[in-house]
Amino acid sequence: MLTLARQQQRQNIRWLLCLSVLMLLALLLSLCAGELWILPGDWFSPRGELFVWQIRLPRTLAVLLVGAALAISGAVMQALFENPLAEPGLLGVSNGAGVGLIAAVLLGQGQLPNWALGLCAIAGALIITLILLRFARRHLSTSRLLLAGVALGIICSALMTWAIYFSTSVDLRQLMYWMMGGFGGVDWRQSWLMLALIPVLLWICCQSRPMNILALGEISARQLGLPLWFWRNVLVAATGWMVGVSVALAGAIGFIGLVIPHILRLCGLTDHRVLLPGCALAGASALLLADIVARLALAAAELPIGVVTATLGAPVFIWLLLKAGR
């Protein structure tokens, strides 16, 4: 038994090392890639200082943090709601951020700066999170809380559709493209949003024990003495914050929060002590690679990264499910 535990521990360490190497390689490739390829030897030249340090580095850091946040959010929600289909957009938090953004554009008549739009997106996500916490205080079951989140997401989606359909504003039509996901407008001015993600990411990665208990199910968690109401509130709030900041940075991006935790579980990473940091590394790597594809796929334009993640991720996910079912 001890030998099996040691073998599993060594395998987990190998997985984390491999994912760390993959993330570093994806990060280096992201800094080099573009219409103008700049190898590491030229990073400190005048051209490299402009393209690498001022344009590509903030974008790469944003992609890395958003990918980690979305993947961890997916892992947390799948454990919290005991549902393998749970992901960051399921509770309506992403759509809530979109409603906040569109309301800011309408009320500000397109004159608000980017930082104000980001704050409005975070505010929209947090409002939906507060509504969910209100439901949680009524001690609803996990399944009913999940259904409440789905209903809120549908309402927010309907509000966005009505606002965009009846609007003649060019800004709102551009926001529809933005809601498909993209990092094209990210620079060092959005560094405050990146910094807002780091403390929550680190904190959640340290909460493996309650996450492991939650994954056993609601009844088992109560029997083991876990304060379920407290952890449900805290984790919903943390997820809402991460998703709100991610939407403010890059728009709505699917696939990462749903598929990355699944892939790691299929690879044998079920302990949240390994799964949470593994999701951060794998989510960052996957989104970095998707961003590189989005930049290089078209010569004079950039694909929405949400389209890239869905196009590349869905077939891989289906293949993994078929492989696991054999």
Curated annotation (Swiss-Prot):
Output one GO BP term.
cobalamin transport
Keyword annotations from UniProtKB, A to Z: Cell inner membrane, Cell membrane, Membrane, Transmembrane, Transmembrane helix, Transport
User: What is any Pfam family matched here?
Assistant: FecCD
Chain ranges passing through the membrane: 19-39, 61-81, 88-108, 112-132, 146-166, 184-204, 240-260, 274-294, 302-322
CDD domains documented for this protein: TM_ABC_iron-siderophores_like (cd06550)
Q: Cellular location of this protein?
A: Cell inner membrane
Q: What GO cellular-component annotations does this UniProt entry give?
A: plasma membrane
Primary place of residence? membrane
State the annotated membrane topology for this chain: Multi-pass membrane protein
User: What does the record give as the function of this protein?
Assistant: Part of the ABC transporter complex BtuCDF involved in vitamin B12 import. Involved in the translocation of the substrate across the membrane.
Family assignment from sequence similarity: Belongs to the binding-protein-dependent transport system permease family. FecCD subfamily.
Subunit composition and interactions: The complex is composed of two ATP-binding proteins (BtuD), two transmembrane proteins (BtuC) and a solute-binding protein (BtuF).
Q: What is this protein called?
A: Vitamin B12 import system permease protein BtuC
What gene makes this protein?
A: btuC
